[in-house]
Amino acid sequence: MQIQCPDYILKAIDILKYNGHSAYAVGGCVRDSVMGRTPNDWDMTTSATPDEMKLAFDGYRIIPTGIKHGTLTVMIDSHPVEITTMRIDGSYSDSRHPESVSFTKKIEEDLSRRDFTVNAMAYSPETGLVDPFGGRLDTERKIIRCVGNPDKRFHEDALRILRAIRFASVLGFGIEEETAASIIKNRCLLNDISKERIRAELIKLLCGQNVEKVLLEFKQVIFEIIPELQATDGFLQHTPYHIYDVWTHIAKVTSSIESTSDLRVAALLHDIEKPSMFRLDEKGVGHFKGHPQKGAQTAEEILRRLRFSNAEIKHIATIIYLHDERPDGNRHHLAKLCAKFGIDNVDDTMKLIIADAHGKNPSIIEQEIQVAENARKQISEMRAENACLSIHALDINGNDIMALGIDRTQIKDTLDYLLDSVIDEKAENKKAALEKAAVNYINKK
């Protein structure tokens, strides 16, 4: 099999070969090439030690990115190329890093330490594809399979548990039976992994094309990371709007929404407090009053634990808080919602409402989708018009208010009143009109 490597990779291979070393493209770039995809990044492995690499690339900019494990980054024709010495890993004690590594000249030994067969392939123009573990066949069959014993692989680095289901989600692959069983068996090892690493893999997993299938098949892994979701599994909703239990509904909504990290995370957590807020009325119909508000609070706690940024937490929690809002077509009501919570947050809430509908009874969701889509059209019109949706967009400011003789303690209330007046079309967003409205407001208080 021939793979089209970029010129800068071929150049790196030629330089190492000229200096007496073997060199290969390796890992995900080879997998993607076998799949017919264009790789985002190209990594290499070589028989050269780090010191030998430095000699071979004399005159090139070299960054010692992982010198302890034999990794250098070499700038070749303005491209950063990560090159790692072929190695054999020693024992693992922290479920993440080998305690020691020993270098090897054999590509097969280096490939044997890798996580999955689809990532355990190497390529050079001289040798062609090097595939000692059947990675090409697994790639063609769309199967994620551990190299060697799955239990051993996951005990070496527990993050591989999440990586496996992330690859299944992103690539649309299935997971081989023995590997899948080991994932479930060893999921508790994820508790030894840093929250930052968990967060990064979880986001990639959630943004994958096959996320619904993965969330349903490997729900135990998700519950290990976010135990607060466990109660949603199998929880029946007892309402004609819902034909799925809460967890299945969550999986469908997550798959339906736009594939951005904040929206996918919001979808995952949006109904997390439905079980705790469930009430059955005298007719046997289920209700979940208050679950968005409580869910937003729980989401904040989870996201803080998983080391999301403050901006991400605020955005996601706001969307969850608002997701039971049902716009009635009244532009003034929608504009006030945008003024209070931010136009981007309200627009993203409408996206969640539309996805939410796709996780409900298909026979009765069309009206709900149409209402939210109409709201998004109105939001788009507001953007185009540069509609006044915050006090900062008013043609008057706090200094102007004080110049009218109004006490500084009344500034915020006055500006809020003026914004409402502009949104309700009771006042024009012009300074003179706003000054008059401000004076009238204070005089009536």
Predicted segments, located by residue:
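Catalytic cores of the polymerase beta-like nucleotidyltransferase superfamily
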Residues: M1-K445
